[in-house]
Amino acid sequence: PPLTIRPQEGIVISLVSDLYLEQGFYFKAEGAQSTFTKDLATPLSPNVKSLKPFIEAHTSTITDFAAQAAVGKKGKNLDLGVMVKYLGAGFQTIGYPFLQSDRLDYLLNTRINAWKNKMNIVASLGQRVNNVKNTALRAKQFIGNLNWFTQFSDKFSLNINYNNFGFQTASGLNPFGIKNVSNDLGINPTFTFTGKKIIHLISMSYNYSKYDERDVMTGLTTSNNTHTGLLTYVPTYLEKEISPDFSILYFYNNVPGAKITLATFSAALSMQAAKKKMRLRGQLQYTLGKLNSFSSNNNLIASCNIDFKLTKKLTWATFLTTNYFKYGNEIIPNGANYVETGCRTGFQYRFDTKKQK
């Protein structure tokens, strides 16, 4: 095996206790101890406590503990609770090799159901303390998430979500502390209009993502900012065997040294034919892309799916596609382009595992 890979072993023993009281009150607690050997090739050590007969301690064996406790109250329309989690500096498990140890998390969790069950909010808010045992390198990080759904009427609903997650340590000097933190915000309104012959569904979504990363050698923090907007329109005909859909996608990504912009327009139509034995779907997609100050790229894709039902369990599936891409002036020669055409066909057989009577 590669010299960088070492034989390892570990064991975790945990004790879980849950207590539920009247009127929705609860208390949950868990304690765990890990004994982990980073390299089985190291010599045995009598100075480290073994966990026989499971593990015999080596010089690379470490033992530590972790604990988690939660207390709160659950109700029909309101949940409120507090959770505290601690992972010791030497706590490590085989199943999660990248688990961030030596940290303390405390969270306030809540769920709110209001407005005659038309509004639902699930949120958590708290703080993470890293390097708990090392005061000089101790760092604090905000953690939280939110999911807020509201059904304003039969025609309009709105969903808002926010997530913050990542890894952060205090910034020292050469090497500097690690920082990989992401903040994501999403807004998704949906409109539905119902007529006698058609149902109109309009869905819009906007997502903003900010990812900060610190270089451990230079100490510089770079940000990756992404904006994504999507507009989708799906009409459903109640008296026709056709299903069209239309969408517009906007994507913007800004990182040091590169700004990428994409705009995609898509239209598709699916229908049944040959007494519903054949299903057809065609799609046309055009993408306009731009990198920094170079001229725009152009991409046109046309595709078609043909599924023909030969028997109850056997289907003949065919896929056709043509892809035309024209580059901007970021490469030489300017205006370079290519056309790619593909055809894929095959048979699909569905096996029925139900027993015949």
Predicted regions and their residues:
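Exposed, low-structure sequence patches enriched in small/polar residues
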Residues: L3-K357
